C-alpha cells in the first residue's frame, strides 16, 4: 500500500480517537477539551504529526477555515509527497466521516460523556406486529471486546473510571505499535476493535453506533474516495470533486458460495462428526482466502469488509474499471479451482453494484436496498454456474463434473474423483479424495488450532514440529494451521522460518510483538466440542464420536441435532431501521453484534466457560429454561456464525442448550422484533448425519412457517387435526415449569426419575393425542376427570392440583392446554428411559 493511501486510512481510523481520551476526564473533573484537540495532542506527542492533523481537521468548518500558509506548514511535517497533498487527504477523511454517520453535529451541542452505547437492536422495529411487546432502550456496558458474555443493561451510565481504564490500556498498546514500527491499518483496526467496540461514537441521546464501527466505515469510505480520485490526487485542489455525492464512486461487492449444504452434509455416517466440523471450518477459511485475495488486489484493507462468514461476504470498494476487472478475474480463477477440486459441487457467485455517496444515507439506490440489488445479481450468477468457463472451455466443465470414465468414488463424500488416497483408521482402510484426506487429519486437530498463516509460499513449517498442525491448499494461497502461539519461544522460532503472509489468531485480539512483519487478523470461531477419550494409546483427548455422545444422554441413548437461525434477517437489515437511520455505520454495528453473538456468545454458553459476574448473569438469564441436568456439556458446535448455527450432541444436552441460547439471545437483543427459530430432532447414533440435518432443517422451516419465534421438536402427526407443530419458546417453558417440572427429580448420578407412576405420564400423553385427533370432542376430558378422581390417593396433592387445571376448558382458545403438553411430555418420556 502506497504511503499516501496508508496515511489516509490511518488518518480515518484515528480521526476521532480523542473521544476515548477526553470523556473520562470530562466526567471526573468536568474538564471540557474537544475530542479534536485531545486526539491531536495524543498523536503529536507520539511523533505522528501528520496523523495528528487528521484528528484536528476532520470537520468541514475547520477545514474551510484553513489558510494557504497552514497547508505550507503541512508540507514541513509530512513525509515527502504526502505533505503536498494533505489538503486533499484531509477533505477525503472529512467527507468519509460525514458519509459514515450524519449524527456528528449534534454532539457539539449536546455533550454528555456519561451516556453509554445504546444497543442498536433498540432501533429495530416494524418486523412483527406491535402486539409482540414494547422495545426496551438498553445500553451496553463499557468494556473491552473479546471472549466475554455481554448483556445490555437498563439505566446504565458510564463512569469516568471506566473510560480511564479503557484509555490507559489503549494508550499503552498503541504506543507499543508505534515503538515497534507496527502502525499498519489492520493492526490499528484490531486494537480499535478491542477497546472501542462499546464506546459510543456520539454522546447524544440515541447514540447507538459504536466508535469502532464509525472509525472502520470512515476508513473504508476514505480508501474508496482516495482510489477513485487517485489519478487526480496530486494535480491540485479536489474539494468539489471529493464532495460530489451524485457521482457513482462506490461498489458494493457481494460474494456467495453455493453448494454449502451439499458439501457439508452429504457425507457417510462413519466418522461424520469429525468431518462435519472440519468441513464447516474449511468453508470459513475458503471465504477468508477469497476475501483476502480481493482486498489485496484492490489495495484495500479489512476496514472495507462489511461482513464475511457463513459462505457469504460483502466488501465496499471504489467504482473503477480496474476494480471491476479484478472482480471478474477473481471469480474466474476461484471457480476454475473449485471446479477442479469439487467437480462443480461448490461455486462462487461474485459480482458488484455501483452506488453514490447519497446512497450511504440509507443504503439504497433509487428506492431499493443495496442488499437486494447485489443479492439479485448473485442469484442470477448462481442460476448460470460456471458460465464464464463454459464460454471459453466447455470441455473442462463437462470433464470435471463427472462426464469421464475411470473415476473412483470417495468413501466419505461419495464424489467421483480421478484419484483416491488410502487412510487407515484402526484396522480399517478408507479410500478418500484429496480434500477429504486433508480434512480427515484436520478434524482431530481442530481443538488444538490457535491460528493459521495464509501465505503464497509453503515455507519450512515442519522445522517447528511443536507448532505445525496441518497445511491446506486454497484457491489463492496455502493455510498453515499452527498451535503454541501463547509461548514466546515458539513464536520466535516461527518468525525465523515463516514466509511472508497474514496470521489469523483464533478467538483473540492480542497482537504479539513477534508478528510485526505480518498482517494480524482476529478470527472468532464458535468451536466448542465435548472431548472424548483418544482411540489409540498415547493420543491426546479428541472430540467424542456420536456413539459415545449418545451414551452420555439423560435417559434414552440418542443423539440430538439442532438447527437455529434469526427470523426475518433480510427485513431487519432492509426495513428494520428507520429510513433516516440506515447509515452504513449503524448497519455495520448491527451486523457485527449479530456475528458476535453467534461466534463468541454461542461458544461461551455452550462451554459454560464464564466466571464471576458473567456466570451470575448467565444463571439468571437461563433460570426458567427446561433443565434435565445441572451440568450440560455434551454438545459439539458444528457451525455457528452470522445468523445461524448447527449443533449435535447428547439429545438431552442439545435440548437444554436450545432454550438456554434462545434466552441469552433474547436478553442480548431485548427486542421482541428480533427472534430465533429452531428445529430439533433426535436420532440413533448410527442414523446418517446428513439425513438428521435435513430433518432438523425441515423442522426449522416448520417453526418459521407457523409464525416464527418457535421451536419445532417433533413432526406433526398425520392423524392430528391441529395444524400446529411448533411451540413458542415462552409457551413451551411455561408449560414445562407449570406441569412437567413437578413430575420428575434428579438422582445422585444426574439421571432423571419420575416422581409419579409412569402410567400417569402415559395417560396425559394419551389424552393429548385424543384431543389432537378429535379436537371438537371432549372424550379426553371426561376420561381425565374420572382418572384424576381414582388417582387422588396415589398422586401427590401438588401434582394433582397442577394437572386438574387441564379440566378447565378455555372456550375461545385453540388449541386447548392439553395439546400444549404433548411435546414437553414426550421429552420427559425420553429422559426417564433406561
Residue ranges and their predicted role:
Residues 706-834:
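Long, compositionally biased charged/polar accessory segments in the mid-to-C-terminal portions
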Residues 386-492, 496:
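Cys/His-rich short segments
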Residues 1-140, 145, 151, 199-203, ...:
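Divalent metal-dependent catalytic cores for phosphoryl transfer on phosphate-bearing substrates
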Amino acid at each position: 500500500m502506497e504511503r499516501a493511501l496508508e496515511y489516509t486510512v490511518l488518518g480515518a481510523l484515528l480521526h476521532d480517537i480523542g473521544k476515548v481520551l477526553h470523556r473520562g476526564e470530562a466526567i471526573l473533573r468536568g474538564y471540557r477539551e474537544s475530542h479534536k484537540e485531545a486526539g491531536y495532542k495524543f498523536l503529536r506527542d507520539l511523533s505522528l504529526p501528520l496523523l495528528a492533523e487528521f484528528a484536528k481537521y476532520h470537520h468541514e468548518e475547520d477545514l474551510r477555515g484553513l489558510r494557504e500558509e497552514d497547508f505550507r506548514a503541512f508540507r514541513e511535517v509530512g513525509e515527502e509527497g504526502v505533505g503536498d497533498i494533505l489538503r486533499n487527504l484531509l477533505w477525503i477523511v472529512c467527507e468519509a466521516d460525514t458519509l459514515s454517520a450524519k449524527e456528528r453535529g449534534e454532539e457539539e451541542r449536546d455533550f454528555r460523556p456519561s451516556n453509554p452505547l445504546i444497543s442498536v437492536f433498540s432501533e429495530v422495529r416494524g418486523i412483527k406486529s406491535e402486539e409482540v411487546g414494547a422495545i426496551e432502550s438498553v445500553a451496553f456496558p463499557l468494556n473491552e471486546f473479546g471472549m466475554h458474555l455481554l448483556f445490555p443493561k437498563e439505566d446504565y451510565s458510564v463512569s469516568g473510571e471506566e473510560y480511564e481504564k479503557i484509555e490507559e490500556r489503549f494508550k499503552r498498546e498503541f504506543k507499543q505499535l508505534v515503538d515497534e514500527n507496527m502502525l499498519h491499518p489492520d493492526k490499528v483496526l484490531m486494537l480499535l476493535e478491542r477497546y472501542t467496540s462499546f464506546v459510543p461514537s456520539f454522546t447524544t441521546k440515541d447514540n447507538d453506533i459504536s466508535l469502532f464501527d464509525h472509525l472502520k466505515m470512515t476508513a473504508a469510505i476514505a480508501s474508496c474516495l482516495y482510489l477513485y480520485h487517485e489519478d487526480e490526487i496530486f494535480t491540485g485542489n479536489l474539494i468539489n470533486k471529493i464532495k460530489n455525492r451524485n457521482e457513482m464512486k462506490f461498489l458494493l461487492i457481494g460474494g456467495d458460495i453455493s453448494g454449502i449444504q451439499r458439501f457439508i452434509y452429504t457425507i457417510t455416517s462413519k466418522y461424520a462428526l469429525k468431518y462435519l466440523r472440519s468441513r464447516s471450518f474449511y468453508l470459513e477459511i475458503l471465504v477468508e482466502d477469497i476475501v483476502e485475495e480481493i482486498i489485496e488486489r484492490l489495495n484495500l484493507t479489512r476496514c472495507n469488509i462489511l461482513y464475511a462468514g457463513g459462505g457469504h461476504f460483502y466488501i465496499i470498494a471504489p467504482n473503477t474499471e480496474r476494480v471491476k476487472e479484478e472482480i471478474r478475474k477473481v471469480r474466474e480463477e476461484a471457480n476454475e479451482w473449485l471446479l477442479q477440486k469439487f467437480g462443480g459441487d461448490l461455486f462462487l457467485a461474485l459480482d458488484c453494484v455501483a452506488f453514490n455517496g447519497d446512497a450511504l444515507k440509507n443504503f439504497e439506490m433509487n428506492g431499493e436496498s443495496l442488499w437486494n440489488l447485489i443479492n439479485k445479481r448473485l442469484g442470477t450468477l448462481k442460476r448460470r454456474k460456471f458460465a464464464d468457463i463454459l464460454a471459453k472451455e466447455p470441455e473442462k466443465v463437462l470433464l470435471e463434473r463427472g462426464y469421464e470414465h475411470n473415476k473412483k468414488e470417495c468413501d466419505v463424500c461419495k464424489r467421483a474423483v480421478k484419484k483416491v488416497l488410502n487412510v487407515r483408521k484402526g484396522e480399517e482402510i478408507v479410500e478418500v479424495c484429496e480434500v477429504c484426506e486433508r480434512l480427515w487429519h484436520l478434524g482431530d486437530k481442530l481443538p488444538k488450532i490457535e491460528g493459521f498463516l495464509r501465505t503464497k509460499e509453503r515455507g519450512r513449517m515442519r522445522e517447528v514440529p511443536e507448532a505445525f498442525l496441518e497445511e491446506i491448499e486454497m484457491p489463492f494461497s496455502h493455510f498453515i494451521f499452527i498451535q503454541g502461539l501463547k509461548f514466546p519461544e515458539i513464536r520466535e522460532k516461527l518468525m525465523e522460518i515463516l514466509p511472508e503472509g497474514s496470521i489469523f489468531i483464533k478467538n483473540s485480539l492480542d497482537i504479539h510483538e513477534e508478528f510485526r512483519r505480518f498482517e494480524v487478523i482476529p478470527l472468532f470461531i464458535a468451536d466448542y466440542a465435548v472431548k472424548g477419550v483418544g482411540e489409540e494409546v498415547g493420543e491426546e483427548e479428541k472430540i467424542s464420536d456420536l456413539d459415545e455422545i449418545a451414551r452420555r444422554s439423560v435417559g434414552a441413548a440418542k443423539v440430538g441435532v439442532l438447527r437455529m437461525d434469526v427470523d426475518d434477517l433480510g427485513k431487519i437489515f432492509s426495513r428494520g431501521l428507520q429510513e433516516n437511520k440506515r447509515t452504513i455505520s449503524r448497519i455495520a454495528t448491527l451486523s457485527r453484534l449479530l456475528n458476535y453473538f453467534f461466534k463468541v456468545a454461542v461458544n461461551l454458553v455452550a462451554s459454560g466457560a464464564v466466571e464471576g459476574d458473567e456466570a451470575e448473569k448467565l444463571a439468571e438469564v437461563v433460570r426458567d429454561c427446561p433443565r434435565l441436568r445441572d451440568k450440560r456439556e455434551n454438545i459439539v458446535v458444528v457451525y455457528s456464525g452470522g445468523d445461524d448455527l448447527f449443533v449435535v450432541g447428547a439429545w438431552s444436552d442439545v435440548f437444554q442448550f436450545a432454550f438456554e441460547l434462545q434466552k441469552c439471545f433474547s436478553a442480548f437483543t431485548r427486542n421482541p422484533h428480533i427472534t430465533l427459530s429452531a428445529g430439533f430432532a433426535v436420532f440413533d447414533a448410527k442414523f446418517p448425519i446428513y439425513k438428521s440435518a435435513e430433518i432438523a432443517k425441515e423442522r426449522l422451516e416448520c417453526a418459521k412457517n407457523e409464525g416464527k419465534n418457535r421451536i419445532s421438536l417433533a413432526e406433526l402427526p398425520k392423524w392430528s387435526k391441529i395444524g400446529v407443530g411448533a411451540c413458542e419458546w415462552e409457551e413451551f417453558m411455561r408449560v414445562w415449569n407449570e406441569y412437567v417440572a413437578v413430575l420428575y427429580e434428579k438422582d445422585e448420578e444426574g439421571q432423571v426419575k419420575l416422581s409419579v407412576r409412569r402410567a400417569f405420564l402415559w395417560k396425559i400423553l394419551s389424552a393429548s393425542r385424543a384431543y389432537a385427533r378429535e379436537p371438537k370432542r371432549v372424550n379426553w376430558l371426561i376420561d381425565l376427570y374420572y382418572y384424576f378422581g381414582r388417582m387422588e390417593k396415589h398422586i401427590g396433592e401438588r401434582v394433582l392440583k397442577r394437572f386438574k387445571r387441564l379440566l378447565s376448558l378455555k372456550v375461545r382458545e385453540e388449541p386447548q392446554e392439553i395439546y400444549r403438553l404433548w411435546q414437553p411430555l414426550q421429552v420427559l418420556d425420553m429422559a426417564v428411559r433406561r
